[in-house]
């Protein structure tokens, strides 16, 4: 282990902003470690006793909080999940249809994407359900990458193709539809060895292959915007957050640097001699003597970490091209990535936010399980939870094909609505009655015509008073007997209404029982929280 140009005494007591996760494909203990990239001191390590002597495959953190990590076993269909916190002994494992060749998860840690041979799997970790399985390529998948906003997932395979899929289509509830990639690139003629994706809403895809070619793809333009050809097969790649520098590794241990800001507007095809140490256009870093398996750049683009097939890894300062740290593991470097400083690494007090369900299904299901997560912000409004319970019951009744409480209420109130419509029609008819006598003096009338008009006026007044009295009586009856429903259509209609009322009563009783169970459950949870 060597340190060059770093005064470790000045930074020994400070907390780093980011760490470096390193894993090697070895069955030996502590083959997965987390180090401080400034000093090279290990802050966390995984002994690997749960692997039972199997070689470590890939290591992937679940989400950005670093509460759990996923560890695959090399050449075995076993996947383990363990807690990072030293006091949390959580460990689960599951058996999958085959060995996992690539894995990634979203920022929340609720979704996991894994590739097994030619197929891409998507699991919901809050329930363990397998949401989708698609045949993504003609040959085995080699790499997976998820976009920064978790909206797109990209796959690369041995057939030389790169495909992009929308996450919303992979997690959709419609399991019968076929998911097709929204982007397809066939820019390589041999196997794709590495795949990296940039940050932002319009990311770019960087790939390298065994055909000596590195390609930079644009999603918005749906084309290859840069192609670099090397004199050696390319095995790994990396691009910084600002998209200004590209690093590509070869099978002989050379690392070539491409400064994108120095290229001209028409320079789309580059020729790189990675073995030439005196190359003035493309700087070559020489610190390895074996195949470069992993390359990664930190967040601010100042440090580059590289690992090779012999287990050697280096940390470089990009601006000066100086190697700050050199160390070795016991086997091939299989995982190398910069991560934020997780609170779980320090071993202090930590409250877990999420616990994955690692009973991963092997066949796609249709939402057979229900996941309820306990919120840290407790809402004490009882009416809010009553509404939530009622909405949940209505949704379950609707999905099962039964009649919901809202539909029953609508059916029960149908006679009252019908009566209200009749009354409204009568009121409109009464408003259209023409009252005579108000305009008696407008025109002279004589003889029998005048006497007849007086009689008509009296009849109209009596009719209007009678209608007003009937309307008042009807309103009074409706107010006094609002709970009573009377229908004159026959005994069958009355029986139907009584049945609906009985169903409403049963639903109200079940709702009260659920409210009582909910109250007891929250009292129990509150008591448990207070006791802790």
UniProtKB/Swiss-Prot annotation:
SMART domains, per the entry: WD40
InterPro entries reported in the protein's UniProt record: WD40/YVTN_repeat-like_dom_sf, WD40_repeat_dom_sf, WD40_rpt, WDR18/Ipi3/RID3
Sequence segments annotated as region (Disordered): 435-464
Gene3D superfamilies: YVTN repeat-like/Quinoprotein amine dehydrogenase (2.130.10.10)
WD repeats: 136-175, 287-326
Compartment(s) of residence: Nucleus, Nucleolus; Nucleus, Nucleoplasm
Basic residues composition bias: residue spans: 451-464
One matching Pfam family: WD40
GO terms classed as biological process: DNA-templated DNA replication; germ cell development; gonadal mesoderm development; rRNA processing
Keywords tagged on the record: Coiled coil, Developmental protein, Differentiation, Gonadal differentiation, Nucleus, Repeat, Ribosome biogenesis, rRNA processing, WD repeat
One GO CC annotation: rixosome complex
Endpoints of the signal sequence: none
Coiled coil: 445-526
Subunit (UniProt): Component of the PELP1 complex, composed of at least PELP1, TEX10 and WDR18. The complex interacts with pre-60S ribosome particles.
PANTHER family tied to this protein: WD REPEAT-CONTAINING PROTEIN 18, WD-REPEAT PROTEIN 18
Function comment: Component of the PELP1 complex involved in the nucleolar steps of 28S rRNA maturation and the subsequent nucleoplasmic transit of the pre-60S ribosomal subunit. Required for processing ITS2 sequences from rRNA intermediates during 26S rRNA maturation. Required in the soma to promote normal proliferation and prevent germline tumor formation.
Family: Belongs to the WD repeat IPI3/WDR18 family.
Name of the protein in question: Pre-rRNA-processing protein pro-1
Gene source species: Caenorhabditis briggsae
Classification of source organism: Eukaryota, Metazoa, Ecdysozoa, Nematoda, Chromadorea
Gene responsible for this protein: pro-1
């Amino acid at each position: 282990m060597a340190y060059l140009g770093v005064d470790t005494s000045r930074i020994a007591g400070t907390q780093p902003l980011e760490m470096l996760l390193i894993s090697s494909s070895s069955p030996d203990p502590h083959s997965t470690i987390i180090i401080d990239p400034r000093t090279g001191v290990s802050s966390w390590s995984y002994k690997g006793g749960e692997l039972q002597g199997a070689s470590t495959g890939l290591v992937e953190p679940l989400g950005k909080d670093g509460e759990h990590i996923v560890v695959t076993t090399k050449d075995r269909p076993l996947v383990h999940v363990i807690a990072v916190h030293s006091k949390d002994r959580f460990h689960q494992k599951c058996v999958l249809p085959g060995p996992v060749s690539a894995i990634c998860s979203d920022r929340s840690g609720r979704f996991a994407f894994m590739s097994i041979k030619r197929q891409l799997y998507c699991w919901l970790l809050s329930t363990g359900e397998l949401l989708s399985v698609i045949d993504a390529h003609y040959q085995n998948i080699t790499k997976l990458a998820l976009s920064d906003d978790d909206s797109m997932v990209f796959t690369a395979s041995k057939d030389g193709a790169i495909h992009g899929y929308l996450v919303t289509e992979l997690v959709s509830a419609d399991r019968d539809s076929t998911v097709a990639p929204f982007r397809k690139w066939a820019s390589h003629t041999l196997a794709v060895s590495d795949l990296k994706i940039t940050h932002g809403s319009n990311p770019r895809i960087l790939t390298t292959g065994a055909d000596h070619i590195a390609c930079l793809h644009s999603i918005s333009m749906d084309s290859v915007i840069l192609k670099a050809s090397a004199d050696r097969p390319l095995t790994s790649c990396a691009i910084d957050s600002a998209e200004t520098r590209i690093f590509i590794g070869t099978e002989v241990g050379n690392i070539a640097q491409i400064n994108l800001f120095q290229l001209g507007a028409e320079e789309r095809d580059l020729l790189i001699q990675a073995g030439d140490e005196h190359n003035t256009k493309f700087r070559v870093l020489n610190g390895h003597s074996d195949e470069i398996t992993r390359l990664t750049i930190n967040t601010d683009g100042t440090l580059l970490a590289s690992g090779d097939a012999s287990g050697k890894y280096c940390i470089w300062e990009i601006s000066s091209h100086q190697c700050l740290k050199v160390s070795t593991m016991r086997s091939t470097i299989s995982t190398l990535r910069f991560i934020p400083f997780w609170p779980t690494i320090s071993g202090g007090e930590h409250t877990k936010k999420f616990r994955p369900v690692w009973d991963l299904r092997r066949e796609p299901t249709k939402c057979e399980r229900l996941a309820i997560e306990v919120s840290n912000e407790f809402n004490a409004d009882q009416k809010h939870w009553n509404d939530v319970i009622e909405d949940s019951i209505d949704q379950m009744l609707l999905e099962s094909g039964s009649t919901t409480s809202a539909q029953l209420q609508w059916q029960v109130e149908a006679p009252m609505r019908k009566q209200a419509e009749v009354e409204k029609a009568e009121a409109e008819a009464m408003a259209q009655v023409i009252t005579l006598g108000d305009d008696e003096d407008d025109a002279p009338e004589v003889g029998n015509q005048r006497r007849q008009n007086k009689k008509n006026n009296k009849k109209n007044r009596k009719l209007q008073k009678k209608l007003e009295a009937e309307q008042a009586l009807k309103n009074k009856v409706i107010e006094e007997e609002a709970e009573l429903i009377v229908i004159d259509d026959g005994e069958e209609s009355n029986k139907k209404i009584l049945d609906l009322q009985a169903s409403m009563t049963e639903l109200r009783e079940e709702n009260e029982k659920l409210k009582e169970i909910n109250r007891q459950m929250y009292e129990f949870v509150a008591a448990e929280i207070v006791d802790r």
